[in-house]
Amino acid sequence: LERCKTAKEAVELITSLIQTYGQAGNCGFDKKFYYDNAFLIADETESYVLETAGRNYAIKKVMDTATISNCYSIRDDYNFASNNFNGDFKATYQNNLFTYVAGAERRKKTSFNILMENDSPFNLMAKALSSHSSDKITVNKSSTDSVCMHAGNMFGDQTTGSYFGEINSCYFVT
């Protein structure tokens, strides 16, 4: 993605790579676990949600606020879809049982609702990324319903680090 100058170029690169090479690779630590990817891609002027299913994908331009959380959100409101797809992308590709067990819709709703609150963008991002589904969640007790998941317990695939920043014309992450 470092070769892209805009969010639109990044979307075009990712979709080109997906169509050429597909998606593969076990993302489970000690078990076989595969899933398709979603991307929230932004530059200083525009943002996109890109959701994938194998070599298929749907792209939706973000008009205001968007969140992703391991569940499909693009229905028939996409700006572009691969292979002349016509229909409801989420209804076609989402595994409802996996999505429910993973708490994906609940996490997505939580992060979106927090971002809609009236506060500074940095405070809202920090609040969203550190939010738990219950006051009972601690470092020793995790939940797939929480945006912030602590490693350990019966779950071994949590993301324990988050990052956010203000997008300017010059932006570096190392």
Residue ranges and their predicted role:
Residues 1-20:
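Well-ordered mid-protein domain cores that form the structural environment of catalytic cofactors
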Residues 11, 15, 26-30, 34-37, ...:
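C-terminus-biased signal that marks the final domain/tail of proteins
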Residues 21-25:
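Phosphate-interacting basic helix/loop segments used at nucleotide- and nucleic-acid interfaces
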